[in-house]
Amino acid sequence: MNRTFPYKPYMTAIRLDAVSKVFEGEHLAVDELTLDIADGEFMVLLGPSGCGKTTLLRMIAGLERVTAGDVWFGRTNGTRLAPRERGVAMVFQTGALYPNRTVQENIMFPLQVAGQNDVQAGSTAAGLAQILSIESVLDRMPRTLSGGQRQRVAIGRALVRRPQVFLLDEPLSNLDATMRTELRQEIGAMTRDLNVTTLYVTHDQVEALTLADRIAVMRDGRIEDVGTPTQVYNDPATAFVAGFLGTPRINLLAATVRVTAHHRVALDLGNQSISLDPTDRRSLILRHHDGADVIVGARSNAFSLTDDAPNQLTGTIRAFEFHGQQSIAFVHCGIEVVDPDRVGRAAPAHASPAADRTPSFLSRLRSRAGLGAPPPPAPEPHGATHRRADVVVELPVDTELARGTRVHLALDTSRIHIFDQTGHRVDRITR
C-alpha cells in the first residue's frame, strides 16, 4: 500500500472496570464486565446476536450511558465524557455515509468540522484514500459505490481524525463472501500498519480467528473467555466457547466418570466408554470424582477410522458429506450430545433459579431500590441440554463410506477437553 497518509495515532489502552448496562424493562445487557485492551491491540468481541457486544462498543464510544462501572482511556476515566471528547471513531454495520456528499467530501467532513481548511483536508483525504484503494472513486456519490467501497469510505472517514481508539461494529456483515474476505484482509493489514487500538465486534468466528490479536468471547452480557485465537480455539475455558468456535462444531458428549479398582479413570458414554492414560494429568484430577457427570469435548479431527485402537467408539454412518478438502461423516453412536448454547444456563433441579447463587448486578440493583425479586423464569424443558444426536467425524477426502456402514472410531484422548455440568473446564490450563 502507498502510505502517503501521515497517520500518527495517539494510542491508548482501554480498561472496562465492572461495566454494566441495564435497559428499561430491567433487561441486563452487560453484566459487570471487566476487560483490558492494550495500546495498539486488535481486540475482537465475538459472540451470538444479543450477547451485549454492540452495547459494550456503544458504551465505549459514549453512545450508551453506563449504568455502573467505569470506562478508562489510559489514565483518564472517560465514563462521563461526551463522545466527542473520547478520541474514539466508530464504523457501523451500514457505513452511514452522507448521501449528498462525494467520497472525498465524506472523508474530509470530520476535518472541516475541526476547523481545517479545505485544501489541507482534501490532501489528507486523498492520501488516506490511497491506503484504502478508493482513490479512483473520490468524486463519486455513495449511491454509485459497491458495498465494499462504501465500507472503505466509512473507515476512511473514521480514521481521518486520527482517533485514539477505532471501533468497528460488524462492518462486513452486509457484504458478499468474496468482498468480506478481501476487506477483512485489508482491515487487518491497515489497522496494524497504522498501529491504532482497535475493537471489532462480530458474530463470525472466521473474522475473529483471522483478525484478532486477542478474542473476548461473550454470552449473556459476560465474557466467557479471553485469549489469543490459538488459545480460545485449542484451550477453551467453557463448553460454550468450544462449541462457538470451529466448523464443524465440536462434539460435546455426556459422560460419567468411573474409577476402577486399580485407580484407572474411564469415561462412560452411555453403553460405550473410553479410558484415560494413568499418567494423564486429567486422570489425577478425575480420580477423586468417581460417579461425577461431565462433558467430553472432541473436535471432528480427533477421531479416525480404526479396527484395533484401545479407545474406540462404535457406530453407524447416518450421513456422509464431501466438502472438497475433507469428508464429514455423521455417525450414530447412541451417545447423548450436549447443546453448547444451553449448557450452563439451565437452573439446578434441586433449587429455584435464585437459590445458592451469588446475586447478580441486576438483583443487587433491585434490592437497593427496595424492589422485590422478579418471578422466576419457567424451568427448562426436560432434555433441553442433552439430546440424542450424531458424532461428527472428519475423514480423509478419499474416504468412501455408504450410509448404514458400521464403523469403529479411534479417539485421541490427548485432544479432548473435559467440562463439568456447568460447562467449565475440569482440566483447565492456566494462561
Question: Whereabouts are the PLM-identified features?
Answer:
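Short coil-to-beta microelement around the adenine-binding A-loop and adjacent beta1/P-loop entry
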Residues: 26-28
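Non-catalytic connector elements of ABC transporters
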Residues: 260-431
